[in-house]
Amino acid sequence: MLLTARTPSRYASALGALSVFMAALLLPLCFTGGVMTTPAIQQSLGGSPAALSWLTNGFMLTFGSFLLAAGVTADAIDRKRIFIAGAALFCLSSLLFCLTHNLFLSGVLRALQGLAAAMILASGSAALAQLYDGAQRTRAFSILGTVFGIGLAFGPLLIGFMIDAVGWRGVYALFALLSAGVLLIGLVSLPAAEKSEPRTPNNLGLTLFTLALMLFTASLMVIPARGFLSLTTLALLIASGGLFVAFVVRCRRVNNPVLELTLLRHPRFVGVLLLPVATCCCYVVLLIIVPLHFMGGEGMSESQSALYLMALTTPMLVFPSVAALLTRWFSPGQVSTAGLMMASAGLLLLGDAFHSNHLPQLVLALILCGAGAALPWGLMDGLAISAVPVAKAGMAAGLFNTVRVAGEGIALAVVSAVLTASNTLTLQSRVHGYAPEVIHRAAGWLGAGNMPQAAALLPDFSLRVLRESYDSAYTLLFSGLAVVTLLCALMIWLTLCRKGGAIQTRNSGS
């Protein structure tokens, strides 16, 4: 695994790469850790489903909203400074999370972790690119992707066993320890930015975009607790819409826009932007709701649920390489479309498995979803860059990553709203003698995958009624996710695979 550095100090560069690799391991651990620790935190600190959801929502809200701003700032100022600042913020917020006894403060600290993650992700890849050239750079980024995949595949298992052994506070102590290592190693080994012409970022454009995206995502996140037509939801939607309009106007009027809107005139690039939307529906969303189902709906421990979740995550270690091999004979668009169709079948099978409570079928469905999503996963970044002119590749990559991460937060908010709404409608039609707010709270717990809490609110009704509501909500959700994934696959086929739209790639006959 030795890499030849482009800088005079080979070992300093190797240490710098190590800090980036450690960060690549930390981010997926933190993402899945927020989910796996939620039931334990609820038992320790209490809280409603809406309050507990911010342990995940808070992280995704700031992670997605600040990613573009962090990347632009890193390019304009110094990638090392942004990377180190992000690691320091991550370490501090994780350490404070270990000590907190307040759920609201926990949500705030998770939001700070999301901001720190955006800073680390946006600057880490660029910092790694400074260390190596040519084939060695390719190898370094291959290792980076592998480490990220390992964190995603085995992170839930590690965290599940840690919760069983030392509790949720020990998990966040591990995050603090890892981020401290990233901070110290990166501080002494990453090279400072090379002197170049100073660039002033479009601060107003970045602010408008970040606030618009944050308010829009927040408006979706409050729907389960407030309702779609509530004053809070509508105010957030209107404010985000106004900010998006102002952002578009700003982009049209300045010479150095945050985003060149002409990128969206490239049909292939629009098709590529649908890839993270599809993989979010058939993979990332499942990383959240499946372990919550295992722990709250099936009564499994954290470590048991993590073992079953590996059916979803393990294919991510293997199938990206399979996808790269398949591009010798098929175009990336064709491979991606086939993978999404496989994942759609897995989602439909998953809905039936939830309803029938057939565990082997559920495991098979998770494998199909994981393998199907993994096929386009390793091809997406290259497709994003190749779908636009070379001069706009950097901006295209920035927009693509923003859509990927922000889309995950938006999708999770929509999923939560759908599950809560479906359970609310079912319970309102079948449960009588309880106040509407009690029924809504029970529906919220069912939407969060917590059957015991819902049953405690409705003690006069059998678990069978709650289970039927729970199962029908998930069946509806998985059917909807399958439809969205299939529609994305169709659009990707039309934009990337049809004659005149396919992105050229080397095949076996070339």
Regions found by a protein language model. Name each.
Residues 67-205:
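Helix-loop-helix hairpins in multi-pass membrane proteins, especially solute transporters
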Residues 176-195, 210-222, 239-253, 489-496:
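C-terminal membrane-cytosol helix-exit motif in multi-pass small-molecule transporters
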Residues 15-30, 34-36, 49, 204-206, ...:
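12-transmembrane solute porter fold
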Residues 37-65, 303-307:
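Extracellular/periplasmic helix-loop-helix junction of adjacent transmembrane segments
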Residues 57-71, 125, 310-322:
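Central cavity-lining transmembrane alpha-helices of secondary-active solute carriers
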Residues 51, 136-143, 392-399, 473:
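Cytoplasmic loop-to-transmembrane helix junctions
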Residues 404-494, 509-510:
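Hydrophobic transmembrane architecture of multi-pass small-molecule transporters
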